[in-house]
Every structure is written in C-alpha cells, then in structure tokens.
C-alpha cells in the first residue's frame, strides 16, 4: 500500500470515529468530546478519561490508546485489524468506549 492509499483509508477511519461520536451524542446522554488535530482524534468522556486514536504513517498503522492499553491496527482485507490478532478496530473502540463511559456505545466504519 502506498502512503497515499494509507492516508485515504486512515482519513475515512478518523472521519467515521468523529461521525460516530456525533451520532452517539445525538442519540444518548454519553456527552463525548471528540477533538481532531491533524492525524489524531482524542475522545474525552465526562469522567475525564480519554481514548486517543492516531495515524502512524511510516508504519501504515492506526494506534489507539485507551485505559485498557495501547493497540496497533493495520488494514487487512478491508478492515483495520489488531497487529497481535486481537480483533478489529471498531469492535475494540466500541468495547473501550463503553467501558470508559459506563454505558453501551457502538462505533462502526459507516
């Protein structure tokens, strides 16, 4: 994958995260604050915990840091998959955001 292809796919992921936060805020009382700065999105929860998602362009990876730990994802077969085999990005974001918010939240690629 070229750098340009990576950036195209990664931008779609970051946009889906931002739109997911907006949708969640419109339909729940979660009160997520999503801030975008270049290739990074920081989601802050009312309890002040955060999830940080950022691009690692040289590695063609997306990194996510949450209270549960740090995770690295690569695009494989159209999905962002954990480099250690621990699942897919949006499933992990859903899991960690739900834990950190204390309520069920759902993120998806679309």
Swiss-Prot record:
SUPFAM superfamilies reported in the protein's UniProt record: Frataxin/Nqo15-like
> The organism sits in which domain of life?
Bacteria
Q: Which InterPro entries match?
A: CyaY, Frataxin/CyaY, Frataxin/CyaY_sf, Frataxin_CS
Q: Where are the transmembrane segments?
A: none
Q: What biological processes does GO assign it?
A: iron-sulfur cluster assembly
UniProt keyword Metal-binding present = yes
NCBIfam families recorded: FeS_CyaY (TIGR03421)
Q: Which family does it belong to?
A: Belongs to the frataxin family.
HAMAP family given for it? CyaY
Q: What does this protein do?
A: Involved in iron-sulfur (Fe-S) cluster assembly. May act as a regulator of Fe-S biogenesis.
Name of the protein described by the UniProt record: Iron-sulfur cluster assembly protein CyaY
What gene is this protein a product of? cyaY
């Amino acid at each position: 994958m070229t750098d340009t292809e990576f950036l195209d796919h990664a931008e779609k992921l970051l946009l889906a995260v931002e739109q997911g936060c907006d949708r969640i805020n419109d339909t729940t009382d979660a009160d997520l604050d999503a801030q975008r700065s270049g290739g990074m999105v920081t989601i802050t929860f009312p309890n002040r915990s955060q999830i940080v998602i950022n691009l690692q362009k040289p590695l063609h990876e997306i990194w996510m840091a949450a209270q549960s730990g740090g995770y690295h994802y690569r695009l494989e077969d159209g999905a962002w998959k954990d480099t250690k085999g621990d699942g897919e990005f949006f499933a992990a974001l859903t899991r960690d955001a739900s834990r950190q918010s204390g309520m069920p939240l759902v993120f998806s690629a679309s």
